[in-house]
Each structure stands twice: as C-alpha cells, then as structure tokens.
Amino acid sequence: MENDEQYHNRVLIAKIWENYLFSQAVSIWGGIPKSQAFNAGERVPYDKESDIYYAMLNDLKACADGLKMDGDVYKADPIFPSGQKSSDLLKWKKFANSLRLRLAVRICNADRSKATEVIDELMENEQNLMTSNEDNCLLQWGDNADTRNYFYDY
C-alpha cells in the first residue's frame, strides 16, 4: 500500500501521526525502541534519543514535502477535517512542519547547528507552519467540540 499512488497522501498522513506519537514518547522516556519497534520479539533494542530525533526530523520533512495537495485524502479525518470531513492536506503539512520546529527546539542544546538549520529552513516558509488556532491539532469525533480528546491537543 505504501507505494500505491492511490494511497500516497494517506500513508504520509499516517507517518506524520506516527512521528507525533513517537515524539510524545521520546519526550517522556528518552530513548525508546523505534527503529525496530514493530518487529516481533521480546528483546527489541532501544534507540538513542538523538537518533530518534534526527529520524523524526527527516521523516517529517519527507512527509510534508511529499503531500500532494490535489491527491488522495481520508474520507473521514478526525484530526484535520476539511469542510467535507475529508482530510485538510494543508493543515497536515502545517502540522508536520510545526512538529519539526518543536523537535528542532528540543535538540538545540545538544546540536545547535542542526537545530538552527531546521529552524532557518522552516522560518523561510512560515506560511507552512501553524499560525492560528484554526490550525490546531485536535482529535475530535463528530461536530461537537466537547468530544475532543485533550491528551492529543497540540
């Protein structure tokens, strides 16, 4: 499915969300099993925190750059629905880039040059970042704002 053009954007959206969840886990626990996390076995090795951050920065850049604004979308998107409830691809792109910005800020004390490189790149295209509450990432079901899950607010 990953190489099937009809699912191109949906795969990238899933990867953006996967990286968001991994970013939450790494910020809480530090090094975690990421590179082999989904392989069967009891003894999955832990990855270094810095390696995970670099991998997420690369993954999110590839996802944001790879989204095709006229491509496929989820028919029902509980996070960034458009007016028709399908995926709002521009908001997914903004989310991926804003998450990259957050990760770059997190690594600035450990690798200032990498952090500066990423931040400078993102600020050159500030229109591709979350800029208002309309861009917020909220996991919500239905039309009722009270049905959102506050754990996933970004």
Language model segments and positions:
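Structured, solvent-exposed acidic/aromatic patches
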Residues: M1-Y154
